[in-house]
C-alpha cells in the first residue's frame, strides 16, 4: 500500500559471540532505491539518532539505476549519517550497474564512490574495514550473472572458491579472530557465505518478497523467483547467521503489501 511504502518499522536482532570484546549496536540499511521518508529522509535519520548506534552499515541498492542517473537521495542521506557515525557501505546490483553499463552511466559510479569516501564513508568493494580490533566488515561485489532474472534462465550456482578469489581466505572459528560481518547484497548464496566463514551476513535485494502472505512469506523477488524462503528474516547455518532486510524502497514493481520497509537494529553482544 502507499501508506506502507512511506512508514518503515524498526526491528531488532540480537547476536551473541565470544569473538566480540564489547557490545555494540549497529544499524543496517538496504534497498532505499531513492525513497524518502520525510524531506531529505529526515524521519529515517531521526529514527537512527534515537537508536544511538555505534555504526551504520548499508547493503546497497540505495539508488535506482534503470536508465536514471540520480544519486542525490543516497548522498544526502549518507552525508547526514557520516557526520554522526562510522558508516560502512557495500554495493548492490544498482551501484554495480553503473560499472556494468558504462556507455549509459559514464563515470557516475566513481563520482558516487568518491563523494562517499570524501564524507568519510568506508566504501567496501571486495574489501574490508575494521570497527575496533574485534569487528571486521567486508563488502562483496557480486558479478552480474548472480542477478539474472529467473524467467529467462536458471540463476547460477556460486562456484567453489568464489569468495576466496574476491576476498581472500575466510575467517576461522577461533575466538581470537575478529567477528566478521559480510555485506553481500543477494541472500541467495548464504551457504557459500557461511562456508567462507562470515559470522554474520547482511543481505537485502528481495524487497521482502514484494507481497507477504502470513505462513508463506514473500511472494516474488526482483529476479522473478516465487515463494523463496529467504525473502526476509533471520537465518542460521552451522552457527553462522544471515539477516535479510525487507529493504526501504521499491523500484520497477512499486508494490508493498503486508511488507513494511525495514530499518534493522543489530545488537551485537559479547558472550
Language-model region placement:
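Conserved beta-sheet core of the metallophosphoesterase superfamily
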Residues: 186-264
Amino acid at each position: 500500500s502507499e501508506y506502507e511504502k512511506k512508514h518503515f518499522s524498526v526491528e531488532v536482532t540480537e547476536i551473541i559471540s565470544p569473538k566480540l570484546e564489547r557490545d555494540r549496536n549497529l544499524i543496517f540499511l538496504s534497498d532505499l532505491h531513492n525513497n524518502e521518508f520525510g524531506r531529505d529522509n529526515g524521519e529515517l535519520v531521526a529514527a537512527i539518532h534515537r537508536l544511538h548506534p555505534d555504526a551504520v552499515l548499508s547493503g546497497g541498492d540505495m539508488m535506482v539505476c534503470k536508465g536514471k542517473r540520480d544519486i542525490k537521495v543516497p548522498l544526502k542521506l549518507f552525508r547526514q549519517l557520516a557526520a554522526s557515525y562510522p558508516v560502512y557501505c557495500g554495493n548492490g546490483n544498482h551501484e554495480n550497474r553503473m560499472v556494468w553499463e558504462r556507455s549509459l552511466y559514464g563515470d557516475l559510479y566513481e563520482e558516487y564512490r568518491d563523494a562517499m569516501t570524501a564524507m568519510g564513508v568506508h566504501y567496501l568493494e571486495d574489501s574490508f574495514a575494521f570497527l575496533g580490533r574485534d569487528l571486521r566488515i567486508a563488502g562483496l561485489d557480486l558479478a552480474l550473472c548472480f542477478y539474472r532474472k529467473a524467467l529467462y534462465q536458471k540463476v547460477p550456482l556460486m562456484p567453489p572458491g568464489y569468495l576466496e578469489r574476491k576476498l581472500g581466505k575466510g575467517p576461522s572459528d577461533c575466538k581470537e579472530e575478529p567477528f566478521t560481518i559480510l555485506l553481500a547484497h543477494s541472500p541467495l548464496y548464504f551457504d557459500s557465505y557461511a562456508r567462507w566463514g562470515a559470522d554474520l551476513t547482511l543481505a537485502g535485494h528481495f524487497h521482502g518478497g514484494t507481497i507477504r502472505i502470513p505462513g508463506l512469506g514473500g511472494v516474488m523477488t526482483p529476479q522473478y523467483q516465487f515463494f523463496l524462503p529467504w525473502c526476509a528474516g533471520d537465518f542460521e547455518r552451522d552457527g553462522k547467521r544471515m539477516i535479510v532486510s525487507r529493504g526501504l524502497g521499491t523500484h520497477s514493481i512499486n508494490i508493498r503489501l503486508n511488507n513494511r520497509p525495514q530499518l534493522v537494529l543489530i545488537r551485537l553482544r559479547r558472550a
